[in-house]
């Protein structure tokens, strides 16, 4: 079984459901992933109408590269690194933080020694906002990961423009070709 899991991690082309984990719980997890990914595609379509891809790309390319930024360094340390998460809600827990002082939370993470901060920007299921990441970026010096359901290259350029140093790519919702393309764009942007 270990070989099968390793194959999934390396190819990112198979789903856990294909590996004999046919439980109702797993099926529910995949259904919510697919639902959130579909919602993300709708958000991207609306965002492209407000700010076309070409403009998002131009803005992102004007920004400095983050190559060599502490995000890579944080993950390469010989000690265990930790990334703290700023999250208002989740599909499984519902509303986690009705009062949501996200900037204060980020400051406290940085003061406590976090190596990076993951900021949820997915709005429909996690009640995240791009604004959270932008305002946190203005406040802390440590690297920021935009945690969203990246389903289009547009979201990578947008992430750079709102202040992210890294993006989350979820293998289960991307084809191997998309994963390779999106990782390349992220590397190009630094």
Task: Kindly give the residue locations of the regions a language model identified.
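Short hydrophobic targeting helices and cationic amphipathic motifs
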Residues: 6-9, 19
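An N-cap/entry alpha-helix motif that binds or orients negatively charged groups
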Residues: 30-97
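Alpha/beta enzyme core
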Residues: 98-117, 157-165, 179-182, 188-189
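Catalytic beta/alpha-barrel core
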Residues: 117-126, 143-151, 165-176, 190
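Alpha-helix-loop-beta-strand connector modules within alpha/beta enzyme cores
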Residues: 128-145, 182-190
């Amino acid at each position: 079984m270990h070989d099968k899991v390793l194959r999934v991690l390396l190819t990112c082309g198979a789903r856990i459901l294909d590996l004999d984990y046919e439980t109702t719980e797993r099926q529910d997890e995949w259904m919510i992933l697919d639902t959130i990914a579909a919602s993300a595609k709708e958000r991207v379509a609306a965002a492209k109408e407000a700010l076309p891809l070409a403009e998002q790309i131009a803005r992102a390319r004007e920004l400095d590269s983050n190559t060599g930024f502490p995000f890579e360094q944080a993950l390469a340390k010989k000690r265990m690194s930790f990334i703290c998460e700023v999250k208002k809600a989740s599909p499984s827990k519902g509303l986690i933080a009705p009062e949501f002082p996200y900037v204060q939370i980020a400051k406290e993470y940085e003061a406590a020694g976090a190596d990076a901060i993951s900021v949820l920007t997915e709005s429909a299921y996690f009640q995240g906002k791009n604004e959270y990441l932008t305002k946190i970026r203005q406040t802390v010096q440590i690297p920021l990961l935009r945690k969203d359901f990246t389903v289009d290259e547009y979201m990578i350029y947008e992430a750079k423009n709102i202040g992210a140093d890294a993006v989350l790519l979820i293998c289960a919702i991307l084809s191997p070709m998309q994963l390779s393309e999106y990782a390349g764009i992220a590397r190009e942007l630094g």
